[in-house]
Amino acid sequence: MSIERAMDILRKYPLCNHCLGRLFARLGTGLDNEERGRAIKDYLLMRIHERILNEGLSDELLNDVKALAVSGHEPSIKFLSNMGINVSPARCYVCGDTIFNRLNEWVNNIVNSLRSLGIEFRSFRLGSRVPLDIQNRELSITTEFNISSAESIKREINRELGKRVSAMLGVSFNREEPDVEVVIDVNTGSVEVQIMPIYISARYRKVHRLINEEGQVKWPIDRVIQAYNAQDVVIHTGGEDPMGVRVLGNGRPVILQVVKPSKRPDVNDVYALLKDSGYDIVLDNLSRVRASAVVKMKARVRDYVITYRVLAITDNSVTNENIKSLHDYFRNRQVVQVFRRGRRIRRRISMVYELDGRVIRDRLVEFLIRCQGNLYIRGFVHGGLGDVEPSIAGTLGFSVRPVEIDILNISD
């Protein structure tokens, strides 16, 4: 029985109630580790006392009671005192009795640090830095006695501090997506607090083709910073739009990373602040997401299906027969894109699913192209220097120059 190993452990190592109870953390319910450790010591003393009554006092049993007393077990200390034997408790072999009597002190440090930030938060995550020698001593016991029911001292510290901080501040513990993260150094008592970013998923539409004098598109970032009283906003987009391309229709996926927010308003209130802002970018369909959504969004870009409208000028006249020929040729056609960087050459295959067009007037053509999200649309139209094969220009046999490009729809 694994709990029977407790006496073997205490014969060799004096342990406080916390550090003994933690070795058997998976046994029993409704007990914290301090209560569990005390209960184990009570049980061991009762077993020893029963044997003394049945067998008489032996050196073995007396030494076991002394081992319990050295581990700070008050009933064992009194038991020996009644026999005229005085035993002083030793320091806990694992924690040195320097951890669990300071929990309230550390809780006050954490609470004061959080309150001094002057920010809104509803959840927190708490971690601790525990000296390596303490962790190694704990590990040596679980290894030596083959204990499989233990939990780590860091886990107990984090849980006990977390419960008390939560009760004092009225905020919840959230391991996955906290508003703030706290780390306490149990050696120094110092506290580090990190304000966690907020991630907002949205769809953006770029309604203006022209850009400002600095060559940049104006996002309503200042409105977002204002809403969250944040330090900054980082923009993560699902793909990139070539310069001068409008994004219409349902818009392109985007995630806004709000850095060090002091306020945490509802996204509906933020959306109301962004409406009719007069910026180049219009944001819709706002929702809170996890940080992992950024990686997932970027990984899906190549699987997007994008519908482009391209207005192009051609060197020669384009006939309806040319349009039909392009339509038939590019239905579900693979296109190879070549990227050169110095001597390195990289090829990427993209799909063109559908191509339609109409002649607006002589040498002015409008194309509707439905293709894979990673297709370089300008290169597909004009062909470049053979960087995209096949291309519209290459198939027609004369120059085709795109002058306007709009994204009409993105299916993700």
Curated annotation (Swiss-Prot):
Domain THUMP: 73-197
Keyword Flavoprotein found: no
Gene Ontology molecular function: any one: tRNA pseudouridine(55) synthase activity
Keywords: Isomerase, RNA-binding, tRNA processing
GO biological process: tRNA pseudouridine synthesis
Catalyses which reaction(s): uridine(54) in tRNA = pseudouridine(54) in tRNA; uridine(55) in tRNA = pseudouridine(55) in tRNA
PANTHER family linked: TRNA PSEUDOURIDINE SYNTHASE PUS10
Name of the protein this chain belongs to: tRNA pseudouridine synthase Pus10
Organism: Vulcanisaeta distributa (strain DSM 14429 / JCM 11212 / NBRC 100878 / IC-017)
Gene name of this polypeptide: pus10
